[in-house]
Amino acid sequence: MSSLKIKLVKGRAGKDKRQLATLDALDLTRKDKVVIKPDNPQIRGMIRTVHHLVEWEEIDS
């Protein structure tokens, strides 16, 4: 099963509540933090919501 490596590359300041809630759900609490999440439609949807704030890539786990 593959996973996604997600990194917050832009700060959280000035973002709307929906974007902040999505970043919290992804556990991206500060700039340059990296998390590994399972590759599923829910996580992909969260990435789509904050695509302009994060970088992500697929990894094999």
Swiss-Prot record:
- Which terms in the Gene Ontology molecular function aspect does this entry carry? structural constituent of ribosome
Q: Which family does it belong to?
A: Belongs to the universal ribosomal protein uL30 family.
- CDD domains from the entry? Ribosomal_L30 (cd01658)
Q: Which HAMAP family match?
A: Ribosomal_uL30_B
> Keyword set for this entry?
Ribonucleoprotein, Ribosomal protein
Q: Which organism is it from?
A: Petrotoga mobilis (strain DSM 10674 / SJ95)
What is the recorded name of this protein?
Large ribosomal subunit protein uL30
Gene3D superfamilies for the chain: Ribosomal protein L30, ferredoxin-like fold domain (3.30.1390.20)
